[in-house]
């Protein structure tokens, strides 16, 4: 199973496995994936709409679940991860990629604010320690955790989410008022460019 956005994990997985289910809350996003799959002649992709916290699949149904930059939209990450555990086969893998909270309160509130202004469906980015706790509490076993920095060019970053102009202006005003600590940590530039922390966690369900 592949969690979106924009189908990238879906298309990559479809070239290596017999069947992929692209799952998302957004009907529009699923339509985009279905059309792109047809254009690429990928016939092993199906789509399903729903919430991460209530997956409409049988127990032990999937070999792998991939979520790429979607978990920060989930309203209850713990519940979603417990659902992932339920639908994974014994020994099945979970791969989660997302923007990561820096953990430090001042930096965290800055990141959450610009994320929410850019996309009002944003709920929260989590720190690495929070991810480890949530995955452990879902009875999944972490095999690997990688963090990195993601450079973000401002114009394309807001364009991807079709952020309304008023909120784009609000982000720029908020950026311009950032403290020296925030500017340094996020490598914030005068043109709006900045970097975000990202995380990838590879975990599995006990066999």
Curated annotation (Swiss-Prot):
The record's section on InterPro entries has: Methyltransf_11, Methyltransf_Superfamily, SAM-dependent_MTases_sf
Q: Which domain of life is it from?
A: Bacteria
Mark the transmembrane ranges: none
GO MF annotations, alphabetized: methyltransferase activity; S-adenosylmethionine-dependent methyltransferase activity
Q: Which family does it belong to?
A: Belongs to the methyltransferase superfamily.
UniProt protein name: Uncharacterized protein YafE
The source organism is Escherichia coli (strain K12)
């Amino acid at each position: 199973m592949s969690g979106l956005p924009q189908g990238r994990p879906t298309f990559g997985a479809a070239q290596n496995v017999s069947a992929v289910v692209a799952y998302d809350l957004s009907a529009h996003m699923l339509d985009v994936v279905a059309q792109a799959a047809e254009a690429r002649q990928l016939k092993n992709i199906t789509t399903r709409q729903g919430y991460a916290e209530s997956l409409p699949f049988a127990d032990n149904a999937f070999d792998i679940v991939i979520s790429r930059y979607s978990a920060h939209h989930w309203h209850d990450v713990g519940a979603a991860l417990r659902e992932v555990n339920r639908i994974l086969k014994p020994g099945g893998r979970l791969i989660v990629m997302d923007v990561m909270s820096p953990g430090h309160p001042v930096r965290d509130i800055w990141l959450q604010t610009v994320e929410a202004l850019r996309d009002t469906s944003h709920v929260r980015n989590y720190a690495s320690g929070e991810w480890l706790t949530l995955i452990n509490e879902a009875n999944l076993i972490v095999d690997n955790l990688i963090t990195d920095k993601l450079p973000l060019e401002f114009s394309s970053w807001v364009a991807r989410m079709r952020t309304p102009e008023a909120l784009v202006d609000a982000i720029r005003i908020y950026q311009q008022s950032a403290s020296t600590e925030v500017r340094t940590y996020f490598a914030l530039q005068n043109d709006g460019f900045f970097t975000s922390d990202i995380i990838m966690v590879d975990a599995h369900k006990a066999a």
